[in-house]
Amino acid sequence: MIGTGSPATHDHLRELGAEPVNYGEGMSEGVRALAPEGVNWALDVAGSGVLPELIELAGGVDHVLTIADFAGAQKHGVRFSRGDSGRALYALAEVGDLVEAGKFSLPVGRTFPLADVAEAHRVGEAGHVRGKLVLLVD
């Protein structure tokens, strides 16, 4: 698996089992260095305008999914998913089992008291957060 991110996130990507590649300019070349024949699938979770590159790397629109770029998906014919709300309870139960077994963890990047919700929102909008932002309710 190949994961893209800033150099500051590369150790984390390795911890997740991915080979890190810098995102942004040169991303395609970095992926090609690791996968000269391209990749089997590409998942866009950032919505940063890379769908044309992902289509080329994955060999076509049928091998690309985005959860972050609705307009780009329409423009390029890529599948877009918001998830399947009908399966949400089933998936939540599965995640709970994985957490209990120690096979899944969700890293917390930063916590905020509910009164600081505006600051939490600003931090999230700025990006570059590793882990989830959590609002604490007293």
Language-model segment annotations:
Residues 1-138:
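Terminal helix/beta-alpha structural elements that buttress the NAD(P)+-binding lobe
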